[in-house]
Amino acid sequence: MGKGDKTHINIVVIGHVDSGKSTTTGHLIYKCGGIDKRTIEKFEKEAQEMGKGSFKYAWVLDKLKAERERGITIDIALWKFETAKFYVTIIDAPGHRDFIKNMITGTSQADCAVLVVACGTGEFEAGISKNGQTREHALLAQTLGVKQMIVACNKMDSTEPPFSEKRFDEIVTEVKSFLKKVGYNPATIPFVPISGFNGDNMLEPSSNMSWYKGWSVERKEGNASGKTLIEALDCIIPPQRPTDRPLRLPLQDVYKIGGIGTVPVGRVETGVIKPGMVVTFAPQNVTTEVKSVEMHHESLPEASPGDNVGFNVKNVSVKDIRRGSVCSDSKNDPAKESKNFTAQVIVMNHPGQISAGYTPVLDCHTAHIACKFAELKEKVDRRTGKSTEASPKFLKSGDAGIVELIPTKPPCVESFTDYAPLGRFAVRDMRQTVAVGVIKSVTKDDGSGGKVTKSAAKKK
């Protein structure tokens, strides 16, 4: 395979706060990644000076995180690494304050979640307890449609005795049982005993665990087996990018560029956009023609899902459209404004309870929407989705329910089954994510009488 031929995949690393996510991720980036020798040497020197000689790999990530949180745009290559088959981008790792929000409004959808659990005595139990984040992260991944999972059983070097087969088996049994409850099929999940710190079973089979015969998975796309974490990553089933769906492109920004005009910028979520196409922006219901499409300052004949593009539109002012607007093909299921919508929400960390009338802010794709919980229709079992109570008075942390939401100003959202990236949202209140949801159905405005530019009218 030539260098340019590898498929790009996105992973998200999840697990309890002390499970060793940073060390494990850092190890992969360090050994297979985009960090050049000079940077590593610089980090190592700093670590030694600070007396963090044992920094190993987490330090790499701490540096990157600190820079990312200070808003320094760091070279995104630092979050990438390569396997035999894939270019892997780590789209986020928790511990980051906005992790949950990021995972939902996701700059992109993760193709696979790597769940890191710590196997040290007492550590695993803490992570999986009622208050541990292990379950919450796994549930979140499942709710947001991350279909594939790999479990890295970390810190095998600190079990009693070290590298204990008995402890590994015990943990695998436990994790399988709760992943099943969340909705994953354990037969499709590789379980790999590793030490992210020492490197056991990360890239090469470990001589410390000769008892480990390897992982194997059964799935309709074909069975697979291997011994190491990197091999498990290599067996991820690459996603089908949704080029055949109608266009949906949520805007991140709209620029006015002298001599060119209005340039909306955003990421193609579904479908394709190309010059000459007549597009409609919702909820504003503005229709115009695309003059050109650019990515990284080069003009493109067309852009497809995953591409971050800027495109030039004719006779539309910067005042007409804004961040959160959605661009669509006016001739193929154009996007419309959403009057109200029904969603399934899971309440995560709300200190009190949510009842009808509650009006928080929803983050859905690039839009920021004030919304009223108009009606709590039913409480449902999180795992099965079956109704457990009709018209509940309130929902509290841990509950899931079907609710009717009415936005204060109509946005453009879609049902999760039609356009997944536009159908997931985070409910934000008190500066944190209090619930997550997926949209089941949307009442749309038929949107007659919008603005149509001359060039668009000509093409109709």
Curated annotation (Swiss-Prot):
The modification 5-glutamyl glycerylphosphorylethanolamine is found at residues 302, 375. Residues 195-197 are annotated as: G5. It is found in: Cytoplasm. Residues 92-95 are annotated as: G3. Gene3D superfamilies: P-loop containing nucleotide triphosphate hydrolases (3.40.50.300), Translation factors (2.40.30.10). It comes from the Eukaryota. Residues 71-75 are annotated as: G2. Keywords: Cytoplasm, Elongation factor, GTP-binding, Nucleotide-binding, Phosphoprotein, Protein biosynthesis. One of its GO terms (cellular component) is cytoplasm. Disulfide bonds: none annotated. Residues 154-157 are annotated as: G4. Residues 6-243 form the tr-type G domain. GO terms for molecular function: GTP binding; GTPase activity; translation elongation factor activity. Pfam families: GTP-eEF1A_C (PF22594), GTP_EFTU (PF00009), GTP_EFTU_D2 (PF03144). Residues 15-22 are annotated as: G1. Belongs to the TRAFAC class translation factor GTPase superfamily. Classic translation factor GTPase family. EF-Tu/EF-1A subfamily. PANTHER family: TRANSLATION FACTOR. This protein promotes the GTP-dependent binding of aminoacyl-tRNA to the A-site of ribosomes during protein biosynthesis. This is Elongation factor 1-alpha 3. The gene is eft-3.
